[in-house]
Amino acid sequence: MAVSHSVKERTISENSLIILLQGLQGRVTTVDLRDESVAHGRIDNVDAFMNIRLAKVTYTDRWGHQVKLDDLFVTGRNVRYVHIPDDVNITSTIEQQLQIIHRVRNFGGKGQGRWEFPPKNCK
């Protein structure tokens, strides 16, 4: 997973099920869209706002016409449903993604590197 660069995006991801979709990167799945069309392809990227970038896509519109596309960007607002593949262990996928986020948040160990949330000096 490419970890989100902003603190806001990482916070949104770890406090929602977006983290599960981010764990599906590299897998082939189907995304149902609000306009009743369907996109089937490999998930390349999912950001904290559920924007999804798919590769090698078969796009089917609501009338059943199919188009093959190299890539497709779907805004989170247009996503109705993302099909989770049967072979995905949901619990372990979420735990792996949380570990990645916490590794980025705490990189460098204690007293090293940068702090995203430096401790406040209480007096």
Curated annotation (Swiss-Prot):
It comes from the Eukaryota. GO terms for molecular function: histone pre-mRNA DCP binding; U7 snRNA binding. The keyword Nucleus applies. Keywords: mRNA processing, mRNA splicing, Nucleus, Ribonucleoprotein, RNA-binding. InterPro entries: LSM_dom_sf (IPR010920), Sm (IPR047575), Sm_dom_euk/arc (IPR001163), U7_snRNA_Sm-like (IPR052840). Residues 16-88 form the Sm domain. Pfam families: LSM. Its main location: nucleus. One of its GO terms (biological process) is RNA splicing. It is found in: Nucleus. GO terms for cellular component: Cajal body; cytoplasmic U snRNP body; nuclear body; nucleoplasm; U7 snRNP. The keyword Ubl conjugation does not apply. Not methylated. Methylation is not necessary for interaction with SMN. Appears to function in the U7 snRNP complex that is involved in histone 3'-end processing. Increases U7 snRNA levels but not histone 3'-end pre-mRNA processing activity, when overexpressed. Required for cell cycle progression from G1 to S phases. Binds specifically to U7 snRNA. Binds to the downstream cleavage product (DCP) of histone pre-mRNA in a U7 snRNP dependent manner. Belongs to the snRNP Sm proteins family. Component of the heptameric ring U7 snRNP complex, or U7 Sm protein core complex, at least composed of LSM10, LSM11, SNRPB, SNRPD3, SNRPE, SNRPF, SNRPG and U7 snRNA. Formation of the U7 snRNP is an ATP-dependent process mediated by a specialized SMN complex containing at least the Sm protein core complex and additionally, the U7-specific LSM10 and LSM11 proteins. Interacts with CLNS1A and SMN. This is U7 snRNA-associated Sm-like protein LSm10.
